[in-house]
């Protein structure tokens, strides 16, 4: 939708110097909450197994500190009792902090409480639009960024474990 270039800042350059910097809205989501149709693969995967899509997002947003398998199993277990949103909404908050995105259309916990599949899809699309591929995992993305001379987003202070 907004070009193919990653949004992660290359070494030694400012964000505005990037050739793709103007292609994405700064401080805005690149897709809407209900734009699931924009990526059929993510939409179908999330409809069938939301824990997989969620887990892939978690691994990227948390920079590999939470393994995909662990996040997926926790999400699945909580889903059986209808509480997966409790585990999911903090990840949305972290994603928003990484990219300075607004809390819309409402609070993160409400988005996940009432629209978990749509929220997971939107978060996956956001990561893809900003240069990360959740389906390949954190380490593979780091390798890809290294080859392309691109660095991952800077973690906001206070988010480091």
From Swiss-Prot:
* Pfam families assigned to the protein according to its UniProt record, in alphabetical order: PLAC8
Supply the gene name: PCR12
Q: Keyword annotations for this protein? A: Membrane, Transmembrane, Transmembrane helix
* Lineage, opening ranks: Eukaryota, Viridiplantae, Streptophyta, Embryophyta, Tracheophyta
Question: By what name is this protein known?
Answer: Protein PLANT CADMIUM RESISTANCE 12
| Highest taxon above the source species | Eukaryota
Q: Does the keyword Transmembrane apply?
A: yes
Q: How does it sit in the membrane?
A: Single-pass membrane protein
The record, for PANTHER family, names: DUF614 FAMILY PROTEIN-RELATED
Membrane spanning residue stretches: 71-89
What family does the entry list?
Belongs to the cornifelin family.
| One GO cellular component term | membrane
Q: Which organism is it from?
A: Arabidopsis thaliana (Mouse-ear cress)
InterPro entries the record matches: PLAC_motif_containing
Instruction: Enumerate the subcellular locations listed in this protein's record, separating them with semicolons.
Output: Membrane
Briefly, what is this protein's role?
A: May be involved in heavy metals transport.
């Amino acid at each position: 939708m907004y070009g193919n270039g990653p949004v992660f800042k290359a070494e030694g350059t400012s964000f505005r110097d990037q050739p793709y910097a103007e292609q994405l809205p700064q401080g805005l989501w690149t897709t809407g909450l209900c734009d699931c149709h924009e990526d059929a693969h993510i939409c179908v995967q999330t409809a069938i197994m939301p824990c997989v899509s969620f887990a892939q997002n978690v691994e990227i947003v948390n920079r590999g500190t939470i393994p995909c398998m662990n996040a997926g199993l926790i999400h699945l277990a909580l889903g059986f009792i209808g509480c997966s949103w409790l585990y999911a909404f903090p990840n949305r908050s972290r994603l928003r902090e990484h990219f300075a995105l607004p809390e819309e259309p409402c609070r993160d916990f409400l988005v996940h409480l009432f629209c978990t599949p749509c929220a997971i899809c939107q978060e996956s699309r956001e990561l893809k639009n900003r240069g990360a591929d959740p389906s390949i995992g954190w380490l593979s993305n780091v390798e890809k960024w290294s080859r392309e001379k691109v660095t991952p987003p800077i973690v906001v202070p206070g988010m480091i474990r």
